Amino acid sequence: MSRSLALVYLSLLCLQTHLSISVTVPIPSVNGEIDAMLNRNGVIGEEEGEEMMPSEISRRVMMMRKQYISYETLRRDMVPCQKPGASYYACRSGQANAYNRGCSVITRCARDTNDIKT
């Protein structure tokens, strides 16, 4: 009888210890940096109680990770093709279908595209 009572007390002690540890120790999240940034208080330009739009959240996450399109890329004077008004597909000479990808009319690898007016 005393052995079963000791087992019950030991079980209760283990359960109580487990619960007290699991409540006080936070489990690290996979996206800890993003969560910290999004939950941070006192962000410049943000008032308390104001919810951010999904685009604003995405912008902030991209800025944090340094994955964004730079202003150098968006300059107006940088054109990908030197021929004004030319399609990007007709811009550079060379092999158009370098690897086995789908063939379409716009890449001019499809058969009988001469009669199609674009």
From Swiss-Prot:
Signal peptide start and end residues: 1-22
Keywords: Disulfide bond, Hormone, Secreted, Signal
Prosegment residue ranges: 23-63
InterPro entries: RALF (IPR008801)
Source superkingdom: Eukaryota
Main localization (coarse): secreted
Site (Required for proteolytic cleavage): 59-60
A biological process term (GO) from this entry: regulation of growth
Keyword Secreted assigned: yes
Keyword Transmembrane tagged: no
A GO cellular-component term linked to this record: apoplast
Cell compartment(s), UniProt: Secreted
Post-translational modification: Proteolytically cleaved, probably by S1P, a subtilisin-like serine protease (subtilase).
A GO term for molecular function: hormone activity
Disulfide bridge positions per record: 81-91, 103-109
Family note: Belongs to the plant rapid alkalinization factor (RALF) family.
Reported function: Cell signaling peptide that may regulate plant stress, growth, and development. Mediates a rapid alkalinization of extracellular space by mediating a transient increase in the cytoplasmic Ca(2+) concentration leading to a calcium-dependent signaling events through a cell surface receptor and a concomitant activation of some intracellular mitogen-activated protein kinases.
Protein name per the record: Protein RALF-like 24
Annotated source species: Arabidopsis thaliana (Mouse-ear cress)
